[in-house]
Design a protein with these regions (language model features):
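Hydrophobic, well-structured mid-protein blocks that either form specific transmembrane helices
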Residues: 89-132
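Short secondary-structure boundary segments
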Residues: 55, 81, 102-104, 123-124, ...
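Conserved beta-strand positions in the central sheet of alpha/beta enzyme cores
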Residues: 52, 100, 120, 139-141, ...
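Glycine-rich phosphate-binding active-site loops on the catalytic face of alpha/beta enzymes
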Residues: 102-108, 142-149, 184-203
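Anionic-ligand binding region
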Residues: 125-138, 150-152, 156
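Conserved N-terminal beta1-alpha1 strand-loop-helix module at the mouth
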Residues: 2-97, 104, 114, 162, ...
Length: 225
């Protein structure tokens, strides 16, 4: 007699080497396409390796393609805010090497995992985190991390010790070190790093310096692993 049902497990795809090493993702959300390549250059100068272009950015597909053509293997390019299979396919066709979502679509995660594509789905509760991991996630994005805080991540890490968590949404210079100390696998960095004002005012030296600070903080997660 079967007492408990079970979902067939999907093997988790390892994070790309660049992300495993750097433990940080720079998120370009609604960045001016005309300034995209300069923004990427500044992030690379600051030591960032993984850069995510969100799919709700104007001209996201064209931006992915332009960055891929301009930088090639110099950047680990990903697509974020991917909501369905069509968007994931378009992203992969235009240079993305990993997929990030604000939610967990188990079918999409499993489909990408079976193809060997790294996927970082979003989750908040313990139930969602476990579902994302069992679907085949490479890393689980804890979102929105800033709203629940460092203590929440630490509490999740208690029962879910072996699931890598990437706090995203509200990660800043004020709390980044605390997230790492609480057991975060790495950091998802939005406007606290890719500040729209720095980009629009072409203050790329400041952007590079800010990136270097976050890179040093995130590196502590790799050393602690």
């Amino acid at each position: 007699m079967v007492l408990f049902g079970s979902m067939q497990a999907v093997s988790n795809v390892a994070p790309p080497v660049e992300l495993e090493r750097s433990r940080a993702v720079a998120i370009m959300r609604r960045t001016d396409p005309k300034l995209a390549c300069e923004t990427v250059e500044a992030l690379l100068a600051g030591g960032m390796q993984a850069i995510e272009v969100t799919f709700n950015s104007p001209g996201a597909v064209d931006m992915l393609r332009a960055i891929d053509q301009a930088f090639g293997a110099r950047v680990l390019l990903g697509a974020g805010t991917v909501l369905d299979a069509d968007e994931a396919e378009a992203a992969l066709d235009n240079g993305a090497r990993f997929i990030v979502s604000p939610h967990t679509d188990a079918d999409l995660v499993a489909s990408l995992a079976r193809r060997g594509v790294a996927c970082i789905p979003g989750a908040l509760s313990a139930t969602e985190v476990l579902a994302a991991w069992r679907a085949g996630a490479s890393v689980v994005k804890l979102f929105p991390a800033g709203s629940v805080g460092v203590g929440y991540l630490k509490d999740l890490r208690g029962p879910l010790t072996d699931i890598p968590l990437l706090p995203t949404g509200g990660v800043t210079l004020d709390n980044a070190e605390a997230f790492i100390a609480a057991g975060a696998w790495g950091l998802g960095l939005g406007s606290a790093l890719v500040d729209p004002r720095l980009v629009s005012e072409r203050r790329f030296d400041e952007l590079a310096e800010r990136a270097s600070v976050f890179v040093r903080i995130a590196a502590r997660a790799h050393r602690a692993a």
